[in-house]
Amino acid sequence: GIGGGSSGAGSDITITGGKVTARGGNYGAGIGGGAYGNGSDITVTGGEVTANSGNYGAGIGGGGWGNGNNISISGGKVTATGGTFAAGIGGGMHRDGNDITISGGEVSAAGGRCGAGIGGGLDARGSGDVTVSGDAKLKVRGGKTGDDGQGAGIGNGGVRDQNGPVNGTEVEPDICALNPSGKIEYYAPGSVMTGTPSKTVTNPTGDFVWDSGTVTTHATCKGKGV
């Protein structure tokens, strides 16, 4: 793949165009860290990018036992598929995905078995710092269940407790700056992500009109103004 070798981190990686196909070996990310290595400060601004891990590493992010941090995609067509127990974009097996921003382009993120589409690998978290904005068109799905629970579309990887498999918790991304043309499509864990999604998220819009008074609290995308 592209990034760190065995026990090596992969950081400060920028792709601006062209056609890039990156496949990591066992424990290595497609783009990012090698075995036990974090994948951080990874930026894609354009091009056609396909990133897959052989096993245990994220498509884009951490290798096996490596976190995926500060990953930004602002354009292009990006397909990221995690290896077994890893996220599509984010953490490798048993590691987290943090500070992930999708602000443009067409992005498809699929978790490997029990991994999140975007977020954490097996038994690991995807932080709340996932932002989808602009004209981004994002497709996500978690990995199918195994002995552990299925991964979230965006959020945590699956885990197993004393009672059996536990599915990964979904984390709500920040869509405050998502344009009307942008969207997030969630597909069933383990699916091929074609046809009708199980859920589509867009940023609702509306108009507020007033002709008098004083604004005392400005509206935000998460709350009304008065």
Where are these regions (language model features)?
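Helix-turn-helix-like N-terminal two-helix hairpins of bacterial/phage DNA-binding regulators
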Residues: 28-30, 57-59, 87-88, 117
